[in-house]
Amino acid sequence: MRPNRFSLRRSPTAVAAVALAAVLAAGAPAAQAAGAAAPTAAAAAAPDIPLANVKAHLTQLSTIAANNGGNRAHGRPGYKASVDYVKAKLDAAGYTTTLQQFTSGGATGYNLIADWPGGDPNKVLMAGAHLDSVSSGAGINDNGSGSAAVLETALAVSRAGYQPDKHLRFAWWGAEELGLIGSKYYVNNLPSADRSKLAGYLNFDMIGSPNPGYFVYDDDPVIEKTFKDYFAGLNVPTEIETEGDGRSDHAPFKNVGVPVGGLFTGAGYTKSAAQAQKWGGTAGQAFDRCYHSSCDSLSNINDTALDRNSDAAAHAIWTLSSGTGEPPTGEGVFSNTTDVAIPDAGAAVTSSVAVTGRTGNAPAALQVGVDIKHTYRGDLVVDLLAPDGTAYRLKNSSSGDSADNVIATYTVNASSEVANGSWKLRVQDIARQDTGYIDSWKLTF
């Protein structure tokens, strides 16, 4: 997040260095009013975003900074190396990527734009984060955290073969720390007709603060509710974000009437006693004592906050893009949406899906989508049972995993199994005190 508005700012001279046609024609969105109606299409459940994957991206960004003068700031080699890393991941995942160049302070900057094929080009949902750091450090929380979460969510879209109703576009902004230069350049150079196609922009800036709060932007009621509902499902209270008002990359979008929202875990403001009581952490201490400092390193991340916010980002993107989650013609989805209660420390329960109309055996990459609501997911053992009773372990219990819910997609090599028949999801709670239920699950052939 850039410093507050009273800090010294340079006046940018943004100059295009690449043709904008590829960026502007890559499917910009149809503007909805800030109070747009909630999506009516049945949204597919978002997958769990693996914390280990997000942290692996942070490790790469840390290494890039270490190899390039200790930072990833605008105009420095570390920033371009960061862009190259993210772009390579997206290119390999099937995205159409575009580098948008601009000039600020006599140095070349870059925005990275990534479009996922498909979706309505007149309704574009964007999600983004600034990729640059300040010059004093690696910027792992500010804003490696947001950049890594958005990247891993984009990769999850690819892994799931997700087909949203809206067109999805992801962005990593340059020179945010100099005054939102990259995002302003993008918005200012987007024709009004293309701006009108933007259904919304989601911003993720500093989402792993070491003494975290859980703050939600209140700029658009639909987006705000989407995030609040997600955290309510985790029994995590939220507050409206005020510290970063106008200080991150959602501001240029908001200024031209695009619905915006986002998440934040706090920067230099001090955590109050009331906030420490509901969120944990240390009262009287900044949410991020290393904000804009050299100590904003890998050790400056709260894993729980990063994990929750990464999953919340995916949830919002899946929900607001209103996708059905159904695969291309020729594939098949078989699901069960009937709730099944899971007894506390009791016998295993099952939920059945009848697969019909298939020929031959199941695929070697059978996708098993699971949505289990539970207050301590480490208690759960989850198996897929083939029609002949063969069990495929999807998830083991883990006493140290205290997070809520199992929302994930697993891949099973079921090529030895006949496709048609009754498949079952089996779930057992092996420890006491926590409860839950199977919300829904599906097989994708």
Swiss-Prot record:
State which residues form the propeptide. Answer: 330-445
Instruction: Please state the biotechnological applications recorded for this protein.
Output: Sold by several companies as an extracellular extract called Pronase.
Q: What is this protein called?
A: Aminopeptidase S
> Where are the residues marked Transition state stabilizer as a site?
Y291
Disulfide bonds listed in the record:
C290-C295
- Record note on quaternary structure: Monomer.
What are the names of the required cofactors?
Ca(2+); Zn(2+); Mn(2+); Co(2+)
Q: Which organism is it from?
A: Streptomyces griseus subsp. griseus (strain JCM 4626 / CBS 651.72 / NBRC 13350 / KCC S-0626 / ISP 5235)
- Superkingdom of origin organism: Bacteria
List the catalysed reactions: Release of an N-terminal amino acid with a preference for large hydrophobic amino-terminus residues
